[in-house]
């Protein structure tokens, strides 16, 4: 896996490109001198967390012939300073999986568990870094 990052203005705006030519803009907050024209690196980490499970869960549920009409994942992370360092790390992350459709809640729950515990490499990376990750699953508005 390889990406390339290029600065595209005189501030903090960067364009990241993957091996397939797909791009994403990265920028700092305005209060730090950025222009707010891209996502923050830590936001990208939470996006990656959601995307990783999203792919896992859709794959599992499709194999089980579950009809997914809508699927949203919301991720909220709390960061804290470790010891005397300036950088903040994610200490706690809460994930909400919201599925709509003709979906068996038990199958949805199992798909999420498999992603969280076995398949999602972003999840494993965050846990190894010390983040405590919790989650809730909703199928058609009801907690599963």
Regions found by a protein language model. Name each.
Residues 1-47, 58-144:
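Extended beta-strand/beta-hairpin segments
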């Amino acid at each position: 896996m390889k990406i390339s990052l290029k600065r595209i203005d005189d501030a903090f705006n960067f364009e990241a490109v993957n091996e397939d030519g797909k791009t994403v803009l990265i920028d700092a907050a305005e209060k730090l001198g950025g222009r707010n024209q891209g996502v923050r690196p830590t936001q990208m980490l939470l996006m990656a967390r959601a995307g990783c499970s999203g792919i896992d869960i859709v794959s599992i549920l499709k194999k089980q012939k579950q009809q997914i009409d809508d699927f949203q994942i919301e991720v909220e992370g709390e960061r804290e300073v470790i010891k005397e360092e300036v950088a903040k790390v994610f200490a706690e992350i809460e994930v909400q999986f919201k599925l709509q459709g003709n979906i068996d809640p038990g199958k949805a729950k199992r798909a999420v568990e498999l992603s969280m515990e076995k398949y999602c490499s972003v999840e494993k990376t965050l846990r190894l870094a010390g983040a405590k990750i919790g989650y809730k699953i909703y199928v058609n508005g009801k907690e599963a």
